[in-house]
C-alpha cells in the first residue's frame, strides 16, 4: 500500500490513541505513550504487524497513546491507513 496523503484516526481521550500518518520515503514510527515503559515494545509489535498486513513500506507514523487496548490501537491504525491511500483495497488481506 502506498501512502499518498496525510490522515488521522482516533482521539487524545483516556484509553484511546491518535494516529497520524503522512507520506514519506522511509519508514518512521514515533510512539508517545503514557504506558511506554510497560507496553512500548508491544505497541511497536502491533504497529509493525498491521503495517506488514497492509504491505506498507514507507510512511511517517506518529502515535499518541493514552492507554488504548491493543484492539483499539490496531483499529485506529487500520482506519488511518485506509484514509491515507487512494489504492483499491484487497479486503481479504485486511479482514
From Swiss-Prot:
Coiled coil: none annotated. GO terms for cellular component: cytoplasm. It comes from the Bacteria. The keyword Manganese does not apply. Keywords: Cytoplasm, Phosphoprotein. InterPro entries: CitD, Mal_deCO2ase/Cit_lyase_ACP. Its main location: cytoplasm. It is found in: Cytoplasm. Oligomer with a subunit composition of (alpha,beta,gamma)6. Belongs to the CitD family. HAMAP family: CitD. NCBIfam families: citD, PRK13253.1. Covalent carrier of the coenzyme of citrate lyase. This is Citrate lyase acyl carrier protein. It comes from Haemophilus ducreyi (strain 35000HP / ATCC 700724). The gene is citD.
Amino acid at each position: 500500500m502506498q501512502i499518498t496523503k496525510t490522515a488521522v484516526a482516533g482521539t487524545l481521550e483516556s484509553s484511546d490513541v491518535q494516529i497520524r500518518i503522512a507520506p514519506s520515503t522511509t519508514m518512521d514510527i514515533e510512539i508517545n505513550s503514557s504506558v511506554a515503559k510497560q507496553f512500548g515494545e508491544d505497541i511497536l509489535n502491533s504497529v509493525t504487524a498491521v503495517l506488514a498486513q497492509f504491505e506498507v513500506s514507507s510512511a511517517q507514523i506518529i502515535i499518541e497513546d493514552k492507554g488504548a487496548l491493543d484492539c483499539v490501537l490496531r483499529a485506529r491504525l487500520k482506519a488511518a491507513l485506509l484514509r491515507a491511500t487512494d489504492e483499491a483495497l484487497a479486503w481479504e488481506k485486511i479482514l
